Amino acid sequence: MQNRQTIFIWAICLWTVTLPSLSGQTTQVEGSVRDPSGAVIANASVVLNSGSYQAAVNTGADGHFLFLTVPSISGTVDISREGFNPVRQWWNLGSATSVRLEIVLHPGAASEQVTVSAARTEVRLSETPGSTILLSGKDVAATPALRVDDVLRQVPGFSLFRRSDSRTANASNQGVSLRGLGGTAASRALVLEDGLPLIDAFGGWVYWDRVPRASLASVEVFRGGASNLYGSDALGGVVQFITRQPERPAFSLETSYGNERTPDLSFWTGTRIGHWDLSLASEMFRTDGYIIVPTSQRGTVDTPANSKDATVDLTVGHRLGEKGRVFARGSFYTEFRNNGTPVQTNDTRMGEGAVGLDQQFGSADSLTFRAHGLVLGYDQRFSSVAANRNSESLTDIQYVPEQVVGGAAQWTHFLGKHQTLIAGMDLMEVMGASDEQLFLSGTHTRNNAAGGRQRILGWFGEDLIRWNSWTIILAGRFDDWNNFNASSICTPVFGTCTSPSVLYPSRSDLAFSPRLSVLRSLGRNVSVTGSMYRAFRAPTLNELYRSFRLANVLTLNNPFLNAERLTGAEAGVNLSMLQHKLDLRGTFFWSDIVDPVENVTTDPSSSPVLRQKENLGRIRSRGVEFDGVVHVNRDIQISAGYDFTAATVVAYTVPPEAVSLLGNKVAQVPQNVFTWEARYWNPSRILLSVQGRFIGNQFDDDQNLYPLGRFYTMDLQIGRNISRNLEVFAAAENILDERYKVANTPTASGSLFNIGPPVLYRVGLRLNFPSEKY
């Protein structure tokens, strides 16, 4: 008994001695907030409570938060962010000198997710008065497709020139179209990676394979004219890839091997050391490909169209206090392609560097700055193939050097909780040329060098108002584009030049692109939207100064092209029912494009058939979009989308030796597109995803003489986690083995088809540290 009393007395004394020191002790509480993919979540609200003490901060651009002098050793933090389910976490100092917390916020209902592409600032999807599709990291992982452009094909209204894909098609066939605006090599939608342009500034096409899949946190697709914020190229919308930012040591790898001898490796790794963060991403791909000409038309010159590419991306960032970050990024990309015959090949080498700043000033202002530069070399060989396809002769060796510099700055100011003001500017200058060695019957006859420089400077502003059940966005942008130092110089080698050398005069033009968008919520589950806008696209240097040949068709450049001008409107309804388990959206859209740049047939009877890039007159695209998703439970999801587009030529001035195109359907635009997906995603049991895609009839040419028939394909992926960090899977694309037509081009005896791929299957594994939480 006496021993117990002694122990008790000593305990009271010890507590009495230490109490003053504990009461005066302060604790440092810090941490980071990220989503399940590992991407940091900026501007999340963090509220710390400990007894009567309370403090609040927002996470910085790097997802970090910090409380320096907390007068307690335990408490809670409440973390919330629009688009995510809130989290409360307990903390205790214990024996450490500070508290470090790692918080993961899981996305909330689909209507509460956040998009940045629609307004150049974060807006809840339920408050976005526009047609936006969000693909999460889970959506990308669940897609059986191997290449990122094939992932986007599940978005109704998204298409590439000539139904091509990046596995085997020439880079110049990778122009993006949204909402039936028609396709050429140049994109009519802007493609970004973390705010930096992915579109080739010289040609307008996209090198999709520059984006390692393992680095993706999400993908956003905004459909509808967006030149009001993004300028040229955003005629039909914006596609943006959002990559992961490191918060703690992490590593992700996906590797697979498939038929056609197709190995692939994609990985991302990142870490944070003090105020520094570092990430490295890379992807390597190769395929032996397939013969793109049908068996009935093949000759001895037809060989598999194949490709190989590699990309590496290194980013270093440094945190500036609690609310800022600077970074530098460097990337390198290389590819080689065989385009279906021994002579016809192309290869690309590209290096890019970028620096950026994200800085918050107080609670109401932020500044974003980006600058980048790119150097590219593109080689291409063209040939003339004999009618029996048993021989070919070299016709053209092209080399395209390209240099690009650009920058952008954006200021954002929050006027309380209900209004956001945005102002900014961006500048891009590209210098490029097409240096050609031309051949006739195997003889080198002349050299031709054509090219120039293009500079586009834009200023934009936006007022975003959210009041009660209304969201109103009023935005506008002025662009000034200039072409200068342009020329076409011919040097004879054998014989004479068919056209004289020309020094083109400098040209300039202005464009104003306004947009008014309104959303009205009719209760918690229904909203209606409407938008009116204008947009534009300046012709690329490729369209102005570079010619190209495909099979028996020679398409000439046109140095006198005008900018495309679009006027559009849309109206839609959004429904969310069954406690957000069912989300539906329908949108009607209407667009008129004046002076669209199209490949117009000028002499169909010649050999090769002659086409030239022309300002067609006016085309009109109108239609409806439907998107829906059913969340049966946490593991099962069913989604579908449908797009109906009627795109026709409504005004046309017939040039000499050409035929009238008035009333024709716009080339490369299918009238009907339907996609669907059913997914069961439970890593502890099975990962199963089935997708289907129907593409309707379309035409390959402006005269509507060469149709491309409808087709339906299905893809499948099945997998399972065999440990917390390791997943094995098998995937197959085109499991119905539908050999659909990709191209239909005229020949002297009829037409030549190119066909899509056969069944493509692969097996692989995904390795993630820490483990992914879907």
Q: Over which residues does each language-model region extend?
A:
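Periplasmic-side early beta-strands and strand-to-turn transitions of outer-membrane beta-barrels
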Residues: 227-228, 240, 248-256, 268-349
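C-terminal beta-signal and adjacent terminal beta-strands/loops
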Residues: 290, 536, 592-594, 599, ...
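Face-selective signature of the C-terminal outer-membrane beta-barrel domain
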Residues: 319-333, 349-496, 503-504, 519-521, ...
